[in-house]
Amino acid sequence: GLRQVVDKYLVQDRSGGGVYESPQFMYIMIALTIFAEYPKEVRMNYVKKYYDAVSKHKINIPTPIMGGVRTPIRQFASCVLVDIDDTLDSIFSSDMAIGRYVAQRAGIGINAGRIRGINSKIRGGEVQHTGVVPFLKKFEATVRCCTQNGIRGGSATVHFPIWHQEIRDIIVLKNNKGTEDNRVRKLDYSIQLSALFYQRFIDNEKITLFSPHDVPNLFDSFGSPEFDELYRTYEADESIPKTTIGAQELILELLKERAETGRIY
């Protein structure tokens, strides 16, 4: 345990091997940094309480805080959610944000469910969309290019709704089948479901898949009372492109990939 603390968390010269602090210095510096802006009359009381709690292992703190909060990086967030819109400006600026936060030791959540599906129209059909996989490969490369100052490799979980047009391709991205062209194995994935889809699974009904840009506000209404009504409205609208799949078929595919890879949430 002590060796792990020294190797992963203590401030040091990772090229030359010099270690500049002990574990107790690490704990007190974390406490001093976190409460540095508190009023003087209460600050040291909080510092002492926090130092006692972490140094006696009564509470645990995440790697980004333990490794970086007392350094010039000042990374206070252990995890960061990057919310991506369906535009190139948003996608590319989000990729830059992912890189910066990975370099600052944060774990990354990528909310990519607004990105439209493959072959969707862009500018009225002037261009066809390449789909989510090429952008996921870009995010994967960004996450893996930083090692979080030698403490650990970057990591990210990408979130998609189960009704996304490309969901069947998304849930297999981590498995060992396929080729490098159609797999993005270094990212993890989270699939968003609700009671509506679970009930359709129980009743052996269909799930309708959409490209997010064809169904305005559907993604943003997830988790609200309006979602179910809006989803059914779009299902009934014959002018909206859509495909259907058996709920049991899709969810069992998801569970199969989860069992085999262990990294679909």
Residue ranges and their predicted role:
Residues 1-265:
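Extended catalytic cores of very large enzyme megasubunits
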